[in-house]
Structure formats: C-alpha cells, structure tokens
Amino acid sequence: METLTVGLGDRSYTIRGGSGILPGIGAFCRELGLGRIVAVVTNTTVGPLYYGPVADSLAAAGFSPLRVELPDGEEFKTSATMNIIYDALIDGGLTRDSFIVALGGGVVGDMAGFAAATYLRGIPFVQVPTTLLAQVDSSVGGKTGINHPRGKNLIGAFYQPRAVVIDVETLTTLPEREYLAGMAEVVKYGVVLDPQLFAEVERNITPILARDRDVLTRIIMACCAIKASVVEKDERESGLRAVLNYGHTLGHAVETLAGYGTFLHGEAVAIGMVQAAKLAEHRGEATADDTGRLRALLESLKLPVELPVFAAEAYREVLLRDKKARDTGLSFVLNNGIGGFSIVRLRDLSEVIDVCGIGG
C-alpha cells in the first residue's frame, strides 16, 4: 500500500492506494475518530459489488452502516437525486457526529460530498472511488456538487474529505468504456504537468489495457501526488488549480450539448484536450508533433478525439455559461508542448470556433 498526504493545515488528509485494501476501511475510519453512524452512499451498479465488504468492515470496526443507493449515471447528478440522499440521512438519524462514505465513481463522490458539505451545515466524509477517473481526479481536492439543466457542476461547494481510500481491485469490475474514459484524466496530468508521466503511459499501453495492478497503482498514485501538490497551492481554483481544467472547457460543452450521459466525462475531456492542443498549436505554444502525439495516445487508449457537430452558436452559448467564465472572458488552459501549460482568457470565442472547426 502507498500513502500520501494532501497538506491543507487542519484539513489535511491521507490518500491510501493499493490492491486489496478495501477490507481495511473500517479500521482506517476508526483511526480517524469518526462517529458511530455512517451512511454509505453508492449506486445500483457499485452497491451490489462492494457495499457488502465495505459494510462488513465498518460493522466489524464498531460502526453502524446505512445503505443509500442511487440510480447510476451522470444524468442523475441532479437536485432530485440529492433529495434521496438527504431523506436517507434524516431518516437514518445522522447527526453532526456521523459521517458519509462515498462508494462509487465521480458522480457518487460529487453528490455524497455535496451532501456532506450541506447536511447539518457539514459532516465528515470519506472518498472510496471505484472508477479510474474518480481515483485519479475527482476524489481528491474537495470539489463537490451537481449539474443543472443549463450547465455542468453549476451548483456545488469546495469541501475536503477526511480521507481517500483507493483499491485498484475495484477496477477489475469496471466496464471497459468507463475504464478507458478514466485514462483521459491520466493523460491530462501528463500533457500539462508531467512529461515523464505522459511518456510512461505511452510506454505502458499494453499493461494499461490489461489493467495491470502494479502499473495502475504506480500511475494512480503519481496522479494523486500531482493533484495534491496543485490543491495544496490553490485549493479554491483561484490560480494554479485551473490547470486541471485542461480539456474541460470544451469537454463540458460537449457533455451539455450532447446530453449528459451521451459521452462519458473522460471521453468529453479527451475531445476537449485535442481541441485545446489545436488552439495551443495555432498560438505557437505547441507544435503539430505535440498535437499528433497527444491525439495518437488518446486513440491508442480507444478514446474519441473528434468534436461532435453542433451549431457554432450553440457552442458559444454553452461556453459563455461555463463556471470558469468571468467578466474578463472565458478561461482556457492550453498545453505548452508536452508537460507545460498556459492559461489564456478569451473575450471573443471566434478564435476557438475557427481553429476547432466548430459548427462545420
């Protein structure tokens, strides 16, 4: 098992990663000094697979677990689904001494974390991500929230977990499409922050596709270390943390226009990264070889790279509603070659529309 710490003063927490560590979650939560009643928020896909061993471990450690099972899918990341969680917490008698375990992928983690942030004005929660995307990205850093029909993640809060527990064994039951979508976030870290990680993914396509546990543990914890370093410097996304939105600006637009659930989040990010690379190339911050290398890696991971066709005005409208849009324009993260980045603010989206071939 590997461990690392996200250093945020009195809100610091530990990330534990390895193979076969899920049965130890009860003892780990006991070490944290958490209250007796725990709501395990999961979904209809993950619950039948992993709620049993998690609940058994928690019960053996002296906790009283409550099962809260949600429908599975990005399309259910809504206020209506949040009320399912709130109702269960109220009916289960959870108090400020109680806590939540988020057992699932990014949607479960975002909603369970938002419930923890808002129920009784805040109770502790522990992230137990079971998808690759959640393990390398959304479970670390404290972003929680839900979607709105007019945009993704428009409602939410920054609220840090008490701990993150990553068991790569959970990836053995992950559908192929979701697993590969998670690799998009791994590639993201390499493109803008770590050229060595990018090269390692290029070298290890075969073991990655075979879900080699040792390779995955190494790559996942490397991503978590990068994410932790960024969050420590910029917890609330006022500066450096914005780099983690590489590929997300157009990616979120793709998700919104296509309808939540049409593209998996990682698939949309893969598309967005290629478009960001085109923009970087157009501005002289990357070469055609850099863009080609990124595109080839994503394609080798069986990820989409082509922007779906919607009217230019539809893209423009969704982009301007992006939560990263401010009075000074819309923030875009661009790659500087492989391993570097810059952040530009665009008042006029015509350049993006022209370079990316939007609407055509």
Curated annotation (Swiss-Prot):
> Among its keywords, does the record have Cytoplasm?
yes
Query: Which reaction(s) does its UniProt entry say it catalyses?
Result: 7-phospho-2-dehydro-3-deoxy-D-arabino-heptonate = 3-dehydroquinate + phosphate
Cofactors per UniProt? Co(2+); Zn(2+); NAD(+)
Q: Top enzyme class of this protein?
A: lyase
Alphabetized HAMAP family for the sequence: DHQ_synthase (MF_00110)
- Molecular function terms from GO: 3-dehydroquinate synthase activity; metal ion binding; nucleotide binding
Q: What is its main location?
A: cytoplasm
Task: State the name under which the record lists this protein.
Answer: 3-dehydroquinate synthase
Which compartments is it annotated to reside in? Cytoplasm
Q: How is the cofactor bound?
A: Binds 1 divalent metal cation per subunit. Can use either Co(2+) or Zn(2+).
Gene Ontology CC entries for this record: cytoplasm
Alphabetized, the UniProt keywords read: Amino-acid biosynthesis, Aromatic amino acid biosynthesis, Cobalt, Cytoplasm, Lyase, Metal-binding, NAD, Nucleotide-binding, Zinc
Tell me the first and last residues of the signal peptide.
none
Source organism (scientific name): Geobacter metallireducens (strain ATCC 53774 / DSM 7210 / GS-15)
- Whether Ribosomal protein counts among this entry's keywords is no
Relate the protein's function as given in its record. Answer: Catalyzes the conversion of 3-deoxy-D-arabino-heptulosonate 7-phosphate (DAHP) to dehydroquinate (DHQ).
Q: Which InterPro entries does the UniProt entry name for this protein?
A: Dehydroquinate_synthase, DHQ_synth_AroB, DHQ_synth_fam, DHQS/DOIS_N, DHQS_C
Instruction: Name the EC number(s).
Output: 4.2.3.4
Annotated binding of Zn(2+), by residue? E185, H248, H265
The record's similarity note reads: Belongs to the sugar phosphate cyclases superfamily. Dehydroquinate synthase family.
* Pathway terms, separated by semicolons: Metabolic intermediate biosynthesis; chorismate biosynthesis; chorismate from D-erythrose 4-phosphate and phosphoenolpyruvate: step 2/7
Task: Please give a single GO biological process term from the UniProt record.
Answer: aromatic amino acid family biosynthetic process
Which residues does the annotation say bind NAD(+)? 72-77, 106-110, 130-131, 143, 152, 170-173
Q: Its encoding gene is what? A: aroB
